[in-house]
């Protein structure tokens, strides 16, 4: 059980050597993501990430596609999914993974991490971050 989402996210960022992170939860109708907590996102962007439609931006793409979305260098290439304002984070390497319900049918939210340096997240790193979503699933299903 997660008692402090902010502290939990900080530990995930430490484990992955990342400087920014977000946790979003799906709205009851399953069409948007609402921000639960964040670390390292500039204040000017908070209103833009507080409610994200499925399919928009990195987190929205991960929710809609139901799979990890990874960008090596957000500063140079938006990868067809990131919004131009995402560059204001100063993040280069980024990864967002969906949080699935116990039965795997529903996207409960998205966990996102980012680092300042360009980085290609490996399949192993993507799988490791997906595994980290288990406590969030338990929290969101309560």
Regions found by a protein language model. Give the residues of each.
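A short, aliphatic-rich beta-strand micro-motif
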Residues: 93-102
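Sensory beta-strand/linker motifs that couple input domains to effectors
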Residues: 105-115
């Amino acid at each position: 059980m997660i008692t402090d989402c902010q502290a939990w996210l900080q530990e995930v960022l430490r484990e992955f050597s990342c400087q920014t992170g977000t946790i979003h939860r799906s709205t009851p109708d399953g069409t948007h993501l609402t921000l639960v907590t964040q670390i390292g996102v500039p204040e000017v962007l908070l209103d833009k990430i507080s409610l994200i439609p499925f399919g928009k931006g990195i987190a929205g793409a991960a929710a809609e596609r139901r799979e990890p979305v990874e960008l090596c260098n957000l500063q140079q290439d938006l990868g067809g999914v990131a919004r131009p304002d995402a560059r204001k984070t100063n993040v280069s390497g980024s990864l967002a993974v969906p949080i699935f319900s116990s039965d795997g049918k529903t996207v409960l939210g998205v966990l996102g991490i980012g680092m300042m340096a360009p980085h290609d997240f490996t399949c192993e790193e993507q799988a490791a971050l997906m595994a980290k979503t288990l406590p969030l699933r338990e929290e969101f299903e309560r």
